Protein backbone atom coordinates (compact mmCIF):
# COMPACT_ATOMS: atom_id res chain seq x y z
CA UNK A 1 0.00 0.00 0.00
CA UNK A 2 1.32 3.43 -0.91
CA UNK A 3 -0.79 5.64 1.35
CA UNK A 4 -0.07 5.43 5.06
CA UNK A 5 -1.82 8.48 6.50
CA UNK A 6 0.80 11.03 5.41
CA UNK A 7 -0.10 14.60 4.53
CA UNK A 8 -0.63 14.60 0.78
CA UNK A 9 -2.50 16.85 -1.65
CA UNK A 10 -5.01 16.77 -4.44
CA UNK A 11 -5.26 20.03 -6.41
CA UNK A 12 -8.11 20.49 -8.88
CA UNK A 13 -8.16 23.60 -11.08
CA UNK A 14 -11.09 25.72 -12.23
CA UNK A 15 -13.99 24.99 -14.59
CA UNK A 16 -13.56 21.21 -14.67
CA UNK A 17 -16.49 18.91 -15.40
CA UNK A 18 -16.31 15.78 -13.27
CA UNK A 19 -19.08 13.31 -14.08
CA UNK A 20 -20.63 10.37 -12.24
CA UNK A 21 -18.43 7.74 -10.57
CA UNK A 22 -15.15 9.52 -11.37
CA UNK A 23 -12.40 8.84 -8.84
CA UNK A 24 -9.33 11.02 -8.25
CA UNK A 25 -6.74 9.89 -5.72
CA UNK A 26 -4.44 12.21 -3.75
CA UNK A 27 -0.68 11.98 -4.07
CA UNK A 28 1.56 9.72 -2.06
CA UNK A 29 4.65 10.51 -0.04
CA UNK A 30 6.86 8.43 -2.34
CA UNK A 31 5.55 10.23 -5.43
CA UNK A 32 5.94 13.82 -4.29
CA UNK A 33 2.68 13.99 -2.36
CA UNK A 34 0.63 15.69 -5.08
CA UNK A 35 -1.96 14.75 -7.67
CA UNK A 36 -2.77 17.79 -9.80
CA UNK A 37 -5.55 18.50 -12.32
CA UNK A 38 -5.44 21.65 -14.46
CA UNK A 39 -8.31 23.81 -15.71
CA UNK A 40 -11.17 23.19 -18.16
CA UNK A 41 -10.92 19.39 -18.16
CA UNK A 42 -13.75 16.92 -18.77
CA UNK A 43 -13.72 13.59 -16.96
CA UNK A 44 -16.57 11.45 -18.23
CA UNK A 45 -18.36 8.66 -16.35
CA UNK A 46 -16.18 6.22 -14.39
CA UNK A 47 -12.82 7.67 -15.41
CA UNK A 48 -10.06 7.38 -12.81
CA UNK A 49 -7.00 9.47 -12.00
CA UNK A 50 -4.58 7.55 -9.80
CA UNK A 51 -2.12 8.87 -7.23
CA UNK A 52 0.61 11.32 -8.19
CA UNK A 53 -0.77 12.03 -11.68
CA UNK A 54 -0.36 15.38 -13.40
CA UNK A 55 -3.22 16.25 -15.76
CA UNK A 56 -2.72 19.59 -17.51
CA UNK A 57 -5.37 21.96 -18.94
CA UNK A 58 -8.15 21.11 -21.44
CA UNK A 59 -7.85 17.32 -21.17
CA UNK A 60 -10.76 15.03 -22.02
CA UNK A 61 -11.02 11.53 -20.56
CA UNK A 62 -13.95 9.66 -22.11
CA UNK A 63 -15.96 7.01 -20.26
CA UNK A 64 -14.06 4.36 -18.28
CA UNK A 65 -10.54 5.72 -18.83
CA UNK A 66 -8.16 4.89 -15.97
CA UNK A 67 -4.83 6.69 -15.60
CA UNK A 68 -2.19 4.68 -13.76
CA UNK A 69 -0.16 6.25 -10.97
CA UNK A 70 2.40 8.93 -11.84
CA UNK A 71 0.99 9.40 -15.37
CA UNK A 72 1.54 12.83 -16.95
CA UNK A 73 -1.11 14.00 -19.40
CA UNK A 74 -0.09 17.22 -21.14
CA UNK A 75 -2.49 19.95 -22.29
CA UNK A 76 -5.27 19.47 -24.86
CA UNK A 77 -5.13 15.65 -24.89
CA UNK A 78 -8.19 13.56 -25.78
CA UNK A 79 -8.36 9.94 -24.61
CA UNK A 80 -11.13 7.79 -26.09
CA UNK A 81 -13.51 5.56 -24.15
CA UNK A 82 -12.31 2.39 -22.44
CA UNK A 83 -8.66 3.24 -23.11
CA UNK A 84 -6.17 2.75 -20.29
CA UNK A 85 -2.92 4.60 -19.56
CA UNK A 86 -0.21 2.63 -17.78
CA UNK A 87 1.58 4.04 -14.76
CA UNK A 88 4.59 6.36 -15.28
CA UNK A 89 3.45 7.11 -18.85
CA UNK A 90 3.60 10.57 -20.45
CA UNK A 91 1.12 11.65 -23.13
CA UNK A 92 2.29 14.67 -25.15
CA UNK A 93 0.24 17.80 -25.79
CA UNK A 94 -2.56 17.71 -28.39
CA UNK A 95 -2.35 13.90 -28.67
CA UNK A 96 -5.49 11.94 -29.54
CA UNK A 97 -5.86 8.38 -28.30
CA UNK A 98 -8.58 6.23 -29.87
CA UNK A 99 -11.09 4.18 -27.92
CA UNK A 100 -10.15 0.77 -26.47
CA UNK A 101 -6.45 1.67 -26.64
CA UNK A 102 -3.82 0.36 -24.25
CA UNK A 103 -1.18 3.04 -23.68
CA UNK A 104 1.93 1.26 -22.40
CA UNK A 105 4.63 3.71 -23.50
CA UNK A 106 5.03 7.47 -23.86
CA UNK A 107 3.05 9.19 -26.63
CA UNK A 108 4.72 12.04 -28.54
CA UNK A 109 2.99 15.44 -28.81
CA UNK A 110 0.44 15.79 -31.62
CA UNK A 111 0.24 12.02 -32.15
CA UNK A 112 -2.88 10.08 -33.13
CA UNK A 113 -2.72 6.54 -31.78
CA UNK A 114 -5.02 3.56 -31.50
CA UNK A 115 -4.88 -0.18 -31.02
CA UNK A 116 -4.18 -2.57 -28.20
CA UNK A 117 -0.62 -1.27 -27.78
CA UNK A 118 -1.12 2.35 -28.85
CA UNK A 119 0.20 2.27 -32.41
CA UNK A 120 1.09 5.63 -33.96
CA UNK A 121 -1.28 6.34 -36.87
CA UNK A 122 -0.27 9.87 -37.79
CA UNK A 123 -0.11 13.43 -36.50
CA UNK A 124 -2.98 15.49 -35.21
Question: Which residue stretches match the model-derived regions?
Answer:
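Structural signal for interior beta-strand "rungs" in well-ordered beta-sheet cores
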Residues: 1-114
Amino acid sequence: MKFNGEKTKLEIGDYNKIRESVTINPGTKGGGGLTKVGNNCLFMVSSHIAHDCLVEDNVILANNVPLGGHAHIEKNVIIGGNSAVQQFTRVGKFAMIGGMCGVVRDIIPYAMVHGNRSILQGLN
